[in-house]
Amino acid sequence: MSDIEIARAASKLAITQIGERLGISPGDLQPYGHDKAKISASFLHSLEDRKDGKLILVTAINPTPAGEGKTTTTVGLVDGLNRIGAKAMVCVREPSLGPCFGVKGGAAGGGRAQVVPMEDINLHFTGDFHAITSAHNLLAAMIDNHIYWGNEQDLDTRRIAWRRVVDMNDRALREMVGALGGVRNGFPRETGFDITVASEVMAILCLARDLADLEERLGQIVIGYRRDKTPVHARDIKAHQAMTVLLKEAMQPNLVQTLENNPALVHGGPFANIAHGCNSVVATRAALKLADYVVTEAGFGADLGAEKFFDIKCRKAGLRPAAAVIVATVRALKMNGGVAKTELGHEDVAALVRGAVNLGRHVENVRGFGVPVIVAINHFLSDTPAEIAALQDYAASIGVEAVLCRHWAEGGAGIEELARKVAAMADSGIADFQPLYPDDMPLFAKIETVAKRIYRAGSVTADRAVIDQLSQFEAMGYGDLPVCIAKTQYSFSTDPSLLGAPDGHEVHVRDVRLSAGAGFVVAITGDIMTMPGLPRKPAAETIRLDDDGLVEGLF
């Protein structure tokens, strides 16, 4: 059966029953149909005095077209924890329509380890992304309107930093000229679109503590600069309060369930290669009050998602992870060892051992944050006993345990061994989490620290304009912010073709952007785009409705 067929055949409980298991009354749920609901802000506020559970991060090796199954493992681990008698919840991000119709075709787990309703989660869900897109574009409209009606703030139209967004992969919108067509349409200027998941509004929603914090952060957004080079904020044109109104319900986390009827919070969705890649702080904090173990994921490999989870989300939200799981597959490590995708079905122990250095690098990096690590081998049918043994031997040689997991085929029953070991690791109290760098380190030094200690770069370079911009950010009072490096997800380097564990390479920072509301500085490297394009054969070509009105093609 395909993922969508498995999801459609699931025996789901009414969302009110899932809520009751967590102690949430029907009055504190805002249902969207029978199988999904938002949790009220008043209920979340009532949890503040409860003790926190243990926070467990699921991350992965660098992703390849062979697939790693990070979300699948995150969901499966929660099902496994509940099977062994633990009270566990999963916290994951909402999928973006862009990749759904581009290359992914869906993102809610897979096989017997999914969150449901899978179709709804992938397509519109509860409307959060629409609200974020609307709030972002309201600010864009108010900027141009402010200029049209006299430009009281003296905005320099050459230095407006706020673009528009849409939740779609559309390369034609990357760069454009707006306000053409004459005087009545405003002042023409260069602008463009980013994808919604790259929006600072998305990052703000995912890092805000509550509605008051959300409004404060929205007001701090730097929309551009005056002709005297001083910053103009969203609050200066009185946009932040109306933006908050649009985001009021989007701030409430979404409650759904796994295939095994365990509670899941699916909320927020910033990308990890062009943003910070973690689900919302509101959802994570709520789950920590409602469960003994909370399993969350961070996007792409540990060099991107895990680093940003630790250095941005945990730092800013005061979270202290108790354990980390790194997902690896035999197939992906063979690809890192030089095997072509078409040959991955054939046994090749030597290639696996060559590629395993990628896993070793990630293990070493996560340990550098003071968080204990275990490896989950996400099983594929083509894996041979010799390959699995070689991977486990390699893991043992670097002092980490690698547990074979069959959750894709067997659900929670196939991951119980990992669940027991992760629970014991989290309960041991050996975690001593520390971010990679202090707040008071200069911004460029923070970029260098991440590049050299996590990516293992030999040098970090930047044009004079980038250095000057960072100096300006520091002069404006933003020098204590963490950095969020936009980089390819496929390699430790900025070259997606450099697989394995390259070192000594150069990281060139070609642009920096201030996300004052979110609370970080974005450094853009390589060819990373904040508006992706569709591939030659987009997944949208095979997504359709069948004769019964059911969706086909999501996977």
UniProtKB/Swiss-Prot annotation:
Record-linked SUPFAM superfamilies: P-loop containing nucleoside triphosphate hydrolases
Pathway note: One-carbon metabolism; tetrahydrofolate interconversion
EC assignment: 6.3.4.3
Top EC group: ligase
GO biological process: tetrahydrofolate interconversion
UniProt key word Ligase: yes
CDD domains per record: FTHFS
Annotated source species: Allorhizobium ampelinum (strain ATCC BAA-846 / DSM 112012 / S4) (Agrobacterium vitis (strain S4))
Sequence positions that bind ATP: 64-71
Family recorded in the similarity comment: Belongs to the formate--tetrahydrofolate ligase family.
UniProtKB keywords: ATP-binding, Ligase, Nucleotide-binding, One-carbon metabolism
Keyword set includes Ligase: yes
Protein name, entry field: Formate--tetrahydrofolate ligase
Superkingdom classification of source: Bacteria
